[in-house]
């Protein structure tokens, strides 16, 4: 069972706030709600807890300021709304936090800032320096320059990447959803609320719902994706409603929320970065023998490789997919896609004869790999796989 610790037991908390909580479509910024949230944050900081905020709302706030019509926005309209909204959003956070003599620092990230190793380290250093001097980083995706091809797509996953980047031990996702149900409760009156989730299994993933509101891009699907990123890196996660004022106090006082347990296996900073990669360059599909070997902490050898998909270069991050079609690990691949296909299913001793050079024995070395799913015994895996056939 997942341990529900008081928030004061955590040392570094990332809080993601959805657009609909901060911005009213007609009235604009919900200042009273923001002031109450900042008072909650001040309470955590008074207990010595580092707090980071991933704040949605720039596009929604800019849309309100510009009085744009309802409905989907074109890319250039969204970017214009973000340009206006980012200024207003940063000002609002700064003013509300200053009531408790807390300084806010704005950070706008693009996908490359967490997916490219050098930029990742630089962004992490900047955030850590802000925390060191007692400021609260207010983080958002830089929607003025991001396009569909180079964006996170939602702030749930961005928040998870920030949590893993900064070594946070708790991620709180606040939105208009109070947690995870076995089915959408507005569609199924028999839907059961899940208070604790010890592992994100295929069954849990199947419970994730779909689309979001006009003011936001997130949904339960993105929250489960965020949970996989965070918990794999040893960070617990909470999904809770932010509709009430002082939602952090409400969580501490027992308000309904879903708690996700972190992985029991600590990972290095480098493996944390690998695990959280949002866009693997390709996929390596492996057999049952390889799954068993990886579960035992061994490297992935070419012999266990059934097929290769995608275009990638040596050193890129790839997803490792088991026979049931589920991702089980991620790692830095030792070969480019073309050579990986040529040696798939072959013994390591044959590599030089096939490729004409002596490459690494492992397709993905265990030091460059992190498990993203728990590997059960083979008999149990086969039984579960049959239920999805």
Curated annotation (Swiss-Prot):
Annotated catalysed reactions: L-glutamate + ATP = L-glutamyl 5-phosphate + ADP
SS bond list: none
Residues that bind ATP: 16, 175-176
UniProt lists the family membership as follows:
Belongs to the glutamate 5-kinase family.
What the entry lists under InterPro entries is as follows: AceGlu_kinase-like_sf, Asp/Glu/Uridylate_kinase, G5K_ProB, Glu/AcGlu_kinase, Glu_5kinase, Glu_5kinase/COase_Synthase, Glutamate_5-kinase_CS, PUA
Pathway involvement?
Amino-acid biosynthesis; L-proline biosynthesis; L-glutamate 5-semialdehyde from L-glutamate: step 1/2
**Entry GO terms, CC:** cytosol
Name of the protein this chain belongs to: Glutamate 5-kinase
- Tell me the compartments it is located in: Cytoplasm
Q: For binding substrate, which residues are annotated in this chain's numbering?
A: 56, 143, 155
One Pfam family linked to the record: PUA
* UniProt xrefs under NCBIfam families: proB
Which CDD domains does this entry report, sorted A to Z? AAK_G5K_ProB, PUA_G5K
Q: What does this protein do?
A: Catalyzes the transfer of a phosphate group to glutamate to form L-glutamate 5-phosphate.
Q: Name one GO biological process term.
A: L-proline biosynthetic process
Listed A to Z, the keywords are: Amino-acid biosynthesis, ATP-binding, Cytoplasm, Kinase, Nucleotide-binding, Proline biosynthesis, Transferase
Q: Which residues form the signal peptide?
A: none
Asked if RNA-binding is a keyword of the record, the answer is no
